[in-house]
Amino acid sequence: MQRNARPLELARWEYLFDGGSRERVIQYLASYQNEDGGFGNGLEPDFWLPDSSAIATWSACQQLIEVNATKDEKIVRNLVNYLLLSYNREAELWLTVTPEHNLYPHAPHWQYTKDVQSKWMYNPSVELAAYLIHWSNEESEANKLGWQVIEKALTYLQQAEDMGFHEINNYQKAANLLQDKMGDSKKVLAKIHQLAERAMNKLPDTWGKSYGATPLDLIHNKEDLLYHQYRNLVEENIVYLHKTITTEGVWNPSWDWGDDQLNFAVAKQQWIGIIAINNQQKLQIFQ
């Protein structure tokens, strides 16, 4: 981390594991924030769009929650304003990918095509809505918009037969933030639980051979109902994490950019720092 990580990931690592300062995390995160309050500039290493986007802003939200940022901090106030201004009233969510993504180096999965939103649906809108509610006053415009999106996202959730694990993660994060405020949280959590169980790759021999959800991608703590159901698989997943550490003490991403290996070499190095933080957090929780 000291040698190869971006300053932001190094600051996060030091904050999470070495008693480092939250102010340093916010300082480096702010360098990715644009004047409109949103985030871009390659914060999410798989697309290098400098302009603000829903996904880069979602990534910033997660990191701000990590350091317990409050609604009164400037970086959060500006972010909330961006979400209010960038909400797409026709689609009734924040567009996940836009045509501008195609203008800059990006992974194939961030390619914009017509009707691509039907693939992403409420990734990351349901989670962005939860952050809006979390960082706004009741009866404010931001709070009302957040609940408006949550209501539609929950209707979609109950109708879903299956769901990609990233979108499930969005719902998990939203439910974790809002469960004491949601009217029928038990029904919501039960549906998320059902979809997570379906999305989980339960075949250890296939982990890492294709891009998919291992148990630790969907089970986040020992209080999770799925943990008690799949404890043996979680323990196998921990063993797998230890086995896949490189000689440099980190993990490589399980995906690439297809034909664009030159730019992926840069993104890969940035992802290694992010994956190291994510996996170290998992190991701390379950060991």
Model regions: which residues?
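Preference for long, amphipathic alpha-helical scaffolds in soluble/luminal domains
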Residues: M1-Q287
